[in-house]
Regions:
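Ligand-binding loop in jelly-roll beta-barrel domains
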Residues: 78, 87-110
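A short, N-terminal "cap"/entry segment at the start of jelly-roll beta-barrel domains
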Residues: 1-48
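Short histidine-centered beta-strand/loop micro-motifs
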Residues: 23-25, 45-51, 67-69, 75-76, ...
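Short strand-connecting beta-turns/loops that link adjacent beta-strands
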Residues: 30, 71, 98-100
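Residue-level recognition of conserved beta-strand positions in structured domain cores
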Residues: 35, 61, 68-70, 95, ...
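Short, conserved beta-strand element in jelly-roll/cupin
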Residues: 50-66
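Short beta->alpha connector loops
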Residues: 39-42, 64, 89
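Short acidic-glycine-tyrosine-enriched beta hairpin
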Residues: 71-87
Length: 110
């Protein structure tokens, strides 16, 4: 793993921001581990996200809802809930908790 070998997942998180915060905690050619902090954000209307790699996400604090385009499946994630999003799967974040920050841990793998 590159550079950041230790730390605290909850460190350096401001009370609120207008934009989501993305911080890569560790990475190599096959793996990226990322902390995402949402402050009530959602994916813009009519926008679908599609990652080149598999993405496993867990909500550590807060809550969110994901929606998948092809299956129309919706998944509400509360603290401790996780989901695997296969590579090239169109999905979107419908909402994140409006009054509490939502802290995600995302693992992107080849």
């Amino acid at each position: 793993m590159a550079d950041r070998r230790s730390g605290n997942i909850y460190a350096k998180i401001p009370a609120a921001k207008k934009k989501e915060m993305f911080r890569t905690l560790a990475q190599n050619k096959n793996l990226r581990i990322e902390r995402i902090v949402s402050f009530g954000q959602a994916t813009p209307e009519n926008t679908w996200l599609k990652e080149r790699r598999d993405e496993w996400v867990i909500v550590l604090k807060g809550a969110a809802e994901l929606r998948f385009q092809k299956t129309r499946r919706r998944v509400i994630l509360k603290e401790g809930d996780y989901v695997l999003i296969p590579a090239n799967t169109p999905h979107r974040v419908e909402w994140t908790h409006p009054r509490r920050k939502t802290i995600w841990l995302a693992i992107h793998s080849a």
